[in-house]
Amino acid sequence: MENIKVDVIIPAYHPGKEFSTLIERLTKQTFPIHRIIVMNTEETYWNKELEEKFSILEVHHLKKQEFDHGATRAWAAELSDADVMVFMTQDALPADKSLIENLVKALTEDEKTGAAYARQLPNENCSFVEKYTRSFNYPDRSAVKTKDDLPVYGIKTFFCSNVCAAYKRDIYQKLGGFVRKAIFNEDMIYEIGRAHV
């Protein structure tokens, strides 16, 4: 596990204060991150001080009309040479210092595992429905799902969170990566394809 290179990829648009907190927490992970690739939409909204503060950042700017959930992530994956690519949203905040370590561990325990996603915890002041949805999509126990689980989970068999998910580069590339035209659910579309290989 120690020779595995990890890049974190974050599409961003007008990142706020929580973005700096996210980067800060990523730099303190127990498993080292090679670099954090930020795909920033609209350079006007980018805070250049972040690059001065965090040398681990590699920022690529694109215009708003160029952004696409699938294509932007696919482009970032092409920029990465890491063994594991962790895709996160700009508002995802690691709850602890072992996030990356746990994702890498999940990917390396079984050579057939191509993706792993982190548990998303609800905010304290969110609605009951949101808390219930989070507990269903992100149970407190890890699970490995395959197409054999379709009778149990239905379409949720292919659930993979775009908030925070890790992908093995070799499997990702073999499957062709994310679809280039996806306004949402690029992660789930990828997982459906992976499960049918």
For every predicted segment, state its role.
Residues L93, K97-K131:
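Conserved donor NDP-sugar-binding/catalytic core segment of glycosyltransferases
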Residues K63-S80:
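Glycine-rich, basic loop-to-helix element that forms the pyrophosphate-binding segment
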Residues I33-E43, L62:
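Short beta-strand/loop segment that forms part of the nucleotide-sugar
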Residues P15-K28:
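Short, well-formed alpha-helical segments that are part of the catalytic scaffolds
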Residues M39-K48, A92-L93:
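A conserved acidic beta->alpha catalytic loop
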Residues K147-Y167, I183, I189:
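A recurrent flexible, glycine/aromatic-enriched loop bordering the glycosyltransferase active site
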Residues M85:
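Short aromatic/hydrophobic "clamp" motif used to bind/position activated sugar donors
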Residues I4-D7, R35, I189:
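Cell-envelope/extracellular polymer assembly enzymes that use nucleotide-activated donors
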